[in-house]
């Protein structure tokens, strides 16, 4: 069909002149790489000596990505400052099982996965976009963390249901997720938390860290984790979960939650939300 349209457009000088901007646009969109592919290109086009130098070194791979961003290439990574807050919490908690909702290009999986020093600890990165997952897999492998990080491609709800089924078989002592990092679609923060509550993936000792609390902002999520039991009871009973009505959530969970603001002096202020499961009433 494209070839026929191209023939029709180019068989007349007038049509050709009128179509030239359109043709350039088509060629541009067909050949233009996404910013995530450009990152992949940048990393794996480094001199072999440099690649060998950073291979198997998570910190060095993170530095390369940070340098790329500092050159003016925007990526949806958590970055150094907010990442440091969560990394310190991971070091304190020492999770055995950690998951993230929104793996993107693998930055957070590398940054946080390297904190899991226990040989039996594992990091599950849930990513809905197969193209992002493919890029992340290559970068995580470069960092030497393929044995520590498992990427699961698909809708978060489906992946969470599968993890609930499979984790007890992989880890016989598994009860709850030790640590959850949320950094995907902002309108899914609350719905996916309710999925985890319903599936009993959140329990005694679970920590939930969420990004982009102020920019672009997730006020509904903050209100949910900081709200009273009465608030969540009404919310769960009146707001249907977009992931399915069966994932109603558990309003009787008592959370201790805090918004931690970060300002790098260059961009608008942002924050992370650190939420701890205290008990269920």
UniProtKB/Swiss-Prot annotation:
Q: What cofactor(s) does the depicted protein rely on? A: Mg(2+)
What class does this enzyme belong to in the EC scheme?
transferase
Summarize where substrate binds, as residue positions. 186, 212
- SUPFAM superfamilies linked to this entry: S-adenosyl-L-methionine-dependent methyltransferases (SSF53335)
Which residues are S-adenosyl-L-methionine-binding? 78, 100, 108, 127-128, 156, 183
The EC number of this protein is: 2.1.1.6
Q: What is its main location?
A: other
Q: Which residues bind Mg(2+)?
A: 183, 211-212
Query: Record's PROSITE patterns?
Result: SAM_OMT_I
Cofactor comment text: Binds 1 Mg(2+) ion per subunit.
Q: Which GO terms describe its cellular component?
A: fungal-type vacuole
Q: Which UniProt keywords apply?
A: Catecholamine metabolism, Magnesium, Metal-binding, Methyltransferase, S-adenosyl-L-methionine, Transferase, Vacuole
| Compartments (UniProt record) | Vacuole
| Pfam families in UniProt | Methyltransf_3
Please give a single GO biological process term from the UniProt record. Answer: catecholamine metabolic process
Q: Give the family, as the similarity comment puts it.
A: Belongs to the class I-like SAM-binding methyltransferase superfamily. Cation-dependent O-methyltransferase family.
Q: Mind telling me what this protein is named?
A: Probable catechol O-methyltransferase 2
Question: Which species is this record about?
Answer: Schizosaccharomyces pombe (strain 972 / ATCC 24843)
**Where is the organism placed in the taxonomic lineage, from the top?**
Eukaryota, Fungi, Dikarya, Ascomycota, Taphrinomycotina
């Amino acid at each position: 069909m494209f070839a026929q349209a191209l023939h029709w457009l180019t068989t007349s000088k007038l049509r050709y002149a009128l179509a030239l901007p359109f043709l350039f646009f088509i060629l541009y969109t067909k050949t233009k790489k996404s910013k995530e592919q450009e990152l992949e290109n940048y990393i794996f086009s480094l001199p072999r000596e440099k690649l060998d130098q950073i291979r198997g070194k998570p910190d060095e791979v993170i530095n390369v990505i940070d340098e790329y961003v500092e050159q003016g290439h925007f990526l949806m990574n958590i970055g150094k400052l907010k990442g440091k807050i969560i990394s310190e919490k991971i070091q304190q908690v020492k999770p055995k099982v950690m998951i993230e909702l929104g793996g993107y290009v693998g930055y957070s999986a590398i940054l946080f996965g390297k904190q899991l020093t226990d040989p039996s600890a594992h990091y599950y990165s849930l990513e809905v976009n197969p193209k992002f997952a493919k890029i992340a897999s290559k970068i995580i492998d470069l960092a030497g963390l393929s044995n520590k990080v498992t990427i699961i491609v698909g809708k978060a709800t489906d992946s969470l249901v599968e993890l609930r089924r499979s984790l007890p078989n992989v880890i016989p002592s598994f009860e709850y997720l030790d640590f959850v990092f949320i950094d995907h679609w902002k309108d899914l923060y609350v719905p996916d938390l309710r999925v985890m509550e319903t599936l009993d993936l959140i329990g005694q000792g679970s920590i939930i860290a969420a990004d982009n609390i102020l920019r672009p902002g997730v006020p509904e999520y903050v209100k949910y984790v900081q709200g009273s039991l009465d608030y969540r009871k009404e919310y769960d009973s009146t707001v249907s979960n977009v992931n399915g009505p069966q994932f109603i959530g558990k309003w009787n969970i008592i959370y201790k939650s805090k918004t931690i603001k970060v300002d790098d002096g260059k961009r608008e202020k942002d924050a992370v939300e650190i939420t701890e499961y205290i008990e269920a009433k």
